[in-house]
Design a protein with these regions (language model features):
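Flexible, glycine/proline-enriched loop segments at strand-loop-helix junctions
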Residues: 16, 111-116, 162, 193-204, ...
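Glycine-rich anion-binding loops of enzyme active sites
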Residues: 57-74, 79-82, 98-194, 341-344
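Acidic-glycine-rich active-site phosphate/pyrophosphate-binding loop
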Residues: 53-64, 207-213, 279-294
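N-terminal glycine-rich phosphate/pyrophosphate-binding loops that anchor nucleotide-derived ligands
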Residues: 1-94, 169-174, 179, 197, ...
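A generic local secondary-structure boundary/capping motif
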Residues: 42-44, 52-55, 91-94, 126, ...
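Active-site glycine-rich loop that binds ribose-phosphate moieties when present
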Residues: 152-161, 197-216, 296
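Small-aliphatic-rich amphipathic alpha-helix that forms the alpha element of a beta-alpha
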Residues: 77-103, 120-131, 208-220, 225, ...
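Glycine-/charge-enriched secondary-structure boundary and capping motifs
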Residues: 2-15, 26-29, 110-135, 142-147, ...
Length: 357
């Protein structure tokens, strides 16, 4: 067994993947009142906490720019590289665009890990970048105490095909394209308590590109976001508020990965489960009656706060196009995709209502 095979990357960090994000509520509070330079070409910036920025190229297209990086969420360096790439690219798909170039962001603990690990990390990333048709154009590395890998991604979208998280309309149906549960499953992995089938299922989900945009060009997608570190509740809240809607979500329609139920029931949680709940609690309403109590196991409530890494897209679109869109998405291999709710007129500060369709 060589030195690489003996290293479990998850044991080198305290938290991994998008669960390592700073708490959304605290971050929003700290950044409140900032007034960055805002030229007219910047169409989407920081105001709605969207997945990427849109810059008007004045040729009928927007430039999409985003970046994402994080610490290891799995033990294998190839898998970690692939997940980091898929996660970064996802933001471009969430804006309705196609990715074009990538720049690497790598912090590497050269004093504690062999530099030879960098090659499988990048090989994994390249396997996904190449599949997405993304050119790796450069990058930057530093020596750091903790391994971190990510990418800055640039892409393009036609102006009339761009998606944002601010366009959902009352009456829209909401489609989620991937199952939930990567946060709790990888928390169990870190403790050595996750079954191999759970781990492999989560990895397969995380390295799956959200490249459905080109296949939905004939569907009138009103709004979109990708579900990552703030969980379904956090990102759906941002989308609902940005769209001035209230989202009615059916807890029993939510798709989840194999092992998510068992891991949540056994208490394999991250700090993000708590911070995501804190961020959304005052904007969320749970409709529970004594008669329904048996249908609301505690793990199903926790799964909406589960921090996803390279999670699915949440799409808002006209109800009449919902089934057609769902069939297209499922035909592309997203077998867990589901219609999980509806958008309705805004109810003051309530962004989400669970099990109230």
């Amino acid at each position: 067994m060589d030195s690489q095979e003996m290293i479990r990357l998850t044991q080198t960090v305290k938290k991994g993947g998008c669960a390592a994000k700073l708490p959304a509520g605290e971050l929003k509070e700290v950044l409140a009142g900032m007034k960055p330079f805002r030229p007219k070409e910047l169409i989407v910036g920081t105001e709605t906490m969207d997945d990427a920025c849109l810059w008007d190229l004045k040729d009928g297209r927007y430039l999409i720019q985003t970046l994402d990086f994080f610490t290891p969420i799995v033990d294998d360096p190839f898998d970690f590289g692939a997940i980091a790439a898929a996660n970064a690219i996802s933001d471009v798909y969430a804006m309705g665009g196609e990715p074009a170039t990538a720049m690497t962001i790598l912090a590497f603990p050269g004093g504690t890990l062999p530099l030879s690990l960098i090659r499988p990390l990048m090989d994994g990333a390249l396997s996904v970048l190449s599949k997405a048709g993304v050119a790796l154009a450069g990058g930057h590395t530093i020596d750091d105490e903790t391994l971190k890998l990510g990418f800055s991604i640039s892409g393009f979208v036609e102006k009339n095909k761009a998606w944002t998280n601010a366009g959902a309309r009352p009456g829209d149906v909401l489609i989620l394209t991937k199952g939930l549960g990567t946060g709790t499953i990888t928390a169990a992995l870190k403790k050595g308590e996750a079954q191999d089938s759970w781990i492999q299922g989560a990895i397969k989900s995380m390295i799956t590109l959200n490249n459905i945009t080109r296949h939905l060009k004939e569907i009138d997608i009103h709004s979109a976001t990708d579900i990552t570190g703030f969980g379904l509740a956090g990102h759906a809240t941002q989308m609902a508020l940005a769209s001035q809607c209230t989202f009615y979500l059916d807890l029993n329609s939510l798709p989840f990965l194999e092992g998510a139920e068992e891991c949540l029931e056994k208490g394999y949680l991250t700090r993000a489960h708590t911070t995501n709940a804190n961020y959304t609690n005052d904007k969320t309403h749970w409709e529970i009656s004594t008669q329904k109590e048996s249908h609301w196991p505690e793990w199903k409530r926790k799964v909406v706060y589960d921090p996803q890494t390279s999670g699915g897209l949440l799409l808002a679109l006209p109800e009449g196009e919902g089934q057609r869109a769902l069939e297209i998405i499922k035909s592309l291999g997203f077998t867990q995709a589901q219609i999980i709710g509806k958008a309705k007129a805004s109810e003051n500060s309530t962004a989400l209502r669970f099990n109230a369709i």
